[in-house]
């Protein structure tokens, strides 16, 4: 079974996807982290001037795909964790992900991971583009101010004000929704949930019965 969770940044996709995967004992794939891995690698001095085709053909990054384990990202065989949450990497990932060759490359990897077993995929175009026939599609929304407050918890203290981050998120939403290639849209047949005033437990209470009915 494939479950997709789409939506803009800060809506709780990662937290929900992890909790849902744990509840169902499914694999979990954070596709945003995959794009940020590419962005991080591309920002390194040794790779900034390398032609995109060569960068993707002999990448300095890699991912581990294994059953019953979250996807792990590596740069030159070194695990990546905190490097992927910087605002610089996030902003560049939003730009870099618009490249058709980058999206095609990533979608191939994501579909390969889906072949490993049942999985919860979170991102921005999982249900609309990559897995349009997923058994369950969820689209999360939330008020921009609440999303900014959540995102600030992941950033170094003092790196951005809540007001500045709110403005960045709104601008990114517009860019994601208006891009020509695979824009951020609500997938057909998706369950839309506003997470502004809901805990992850409350969201799980809404969706787990639906998923069990699809599994029956």
Curated annotation (Swiss-Prot):
Its main location: cytoplasm. It catalyses: CMP + ATP = CDP + ADP; dCMP + ATP = dCDP + ADP. It comes from the Bacteria. The lineage of its organism: Bacteria, Pseudomonadati, Chlamydiota, Chlamydiia, Chlamydiales. Gene3D superfamilies: P-loop containing nucleotide triphosphate hydrolases. One of its GO terms (molecular function) is ATP binding. This is Cytidylate kinase. It comes from Chlamydia muridarum (strain MoPn / Nigg). InterPro entries: Cytidylate_kin, Cytidylate_kinase_dom, P-loop_NTPase. It is found in: Cytoplasm. Its EC number is 2.7.4.25. One of its GO terms (biological process) is pyrimidine nucleotide metabolic process. Transmembrane segments: none annotated. ATP binds at residues 7-15.
């Amino acid at each position: 079974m494939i479950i997709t969770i789409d939506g803009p940044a800060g809506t709780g996709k990662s937290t929900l996807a992890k909790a849902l995967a744990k509840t169902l004992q499914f694999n979990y794939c954070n596709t945003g982290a995959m794009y940020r891995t590419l962005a991080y690698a591309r920002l390194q001095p040794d790779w900034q001037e390398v032609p995109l085709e060569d960068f993707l053909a002999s990448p300095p990054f890699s991912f581990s795909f294994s059953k019953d384990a979250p996807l792990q990202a590596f740069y030159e065989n070194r695990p990546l964790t905190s490097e992927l949450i910087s605002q610089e990497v996030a902003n560049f990932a939003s730009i870099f992900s618009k490249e058709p060759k980058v999206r095609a490359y990533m979608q191939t990897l994501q579909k390969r991971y889906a072949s490993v077993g049942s999985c919860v995929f979170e991102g921005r175009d999982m249900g609309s583009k990559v897995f349009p026939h997923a058994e369950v599609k969820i689209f999360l929304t939330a008020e921009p101010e609440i999303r900014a407050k959540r995102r600030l918890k992941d950033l170094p203290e003092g790196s951005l004000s809540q007001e500045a981050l709110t403005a960045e998120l709104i601008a990114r939403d517009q860019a994601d929704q208006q891009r020509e290639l695979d824009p951020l849209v609500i997938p057909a047949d998706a369950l839309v949930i506003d997470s502004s005033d809901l805990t992850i437990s409350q969201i799980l209470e809404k969706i787990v019965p639906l998923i069990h009915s699809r599994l029956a």
